[in-house]
Amino acid sequence: MTWLGALDSPHRSWRRIAAAVGPGLVVMLADTEVGSVISASQSGARWGYRLLALQFLLVPILYATQELALRLGVTTGQGLGELIRARLGRGWALLATSTLVVSCIGALLTQMSGLAGVGQIFGVPSWITIGLIVTAIFVMVCTGSYHAVERVALVLGCAELAFLVVAWRSHPDVGHMLAQVVQQPLTDHDYLYLLAANLGTCVMPWTVFYQQSAVIDKKLTLPDLKLARLDTLVGAIACQTITAAVVMAAASTLGGHAGGASLDSVPQIADAFSKALSPSTGRIVFALGLAGGALVATIVVCLTVAWTLGEVTGFHHSLEHHPLEAPWFYACLLYTSPSPRD
């Protein structure tokens, strides 16, 4: 049965579809986080549309990686940390988890810097922005089920569609775009650096660990696999389409030629994108898109660390458990949450 067949089957109710959809979309929306937006903005500002095609070429790679995590979770009923421990031993599991934690710390610092930058656009001190966000996320996770947290993440992720609006209003020159897409200066070190940066922000360790653990917390089984794969594919396409929109907007508004503008901070990028709209509207739309991706990524990263540490150490871990039933899980979640000092 094909994916479309699975959707059309009389045995597939809307409730079943809703039950299977979610982990793939959430993790892909988290993948369009602050680091991805900055890399895409710099790519468009400096090299125009030359790195645009790469964004769509990465869809199969992104899907294949996340689909493997999905399949492992559904078929084994184990998270990646738990699976590594069972198959390869405690030492390899601890090594993988240590690497993951380092990656997650870096990701959290990136998201917090981006969210602090969004606050600065509107004159809000960084410590207030980060403090409010961390408190809200922790309260949400402690008081909500997996399904509730997932729905909130999906709603926040929808804010990333703002980048599509910016790209559309930047009025890209199609002829110029097609001419630059085929120009690939592969001998230029700066170009290769940005190409590598785009590759690096496409697939990250915490996205793989998250999806495998999320399908378990959501209790997906083999009958859900086809729809869950479709969920992941749609998410991968959405993720790279949003990233491509950022590249297009930066290329259209900043000229996109070698030696072009250098975008090193969130306010700088917001000012550049405001050229596609009015200054005030442009900043609001950009802030909305960036904050949406950063918030989803923050939720995903914190849950990934808590889930994986629980898997490796053998403690129960689920958003379906009350904090008193799973103190280790929520303690890990609190510990990994960034503080306003960050």
Provide a role label for each language-model segment.
Residues 63-75, 237-268:
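Extracellular/periplasmic helix-exit of transmembrane alpha-helices
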Residues 335-342:
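Conserved small/polar residues in nucleotide/adenosyl-binding loops
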Residues 27, 54-87, 95-106:
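Juxtamembrane transmembrane-helix boundary signature
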Residues 71, 75, 93-124, 130-134, ...:
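Hydrophobic transmembrane alpha-helices that form the core helical bundles
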Residues 10-14, 48, 75-102, 121-126, ...:
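Transmembrane-helix boundary/entry motifs in multi-pass membrane transporters
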Residues 157-183, 192-212:
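Hydrophobic alpha-helical segments and their helix-loop junctions in multi-pass secondary transporters
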Residues 1-35, 91, 194, 220-226, ...:
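Membrane-interface "cap" regions at the ends of multi-pass membrane proteins
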Residues 34, 38-40, 209-238, 257-268:
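Hydrophobic, small-residue-rich membrane helices and short re-entrant helix-turn-helix hairpins
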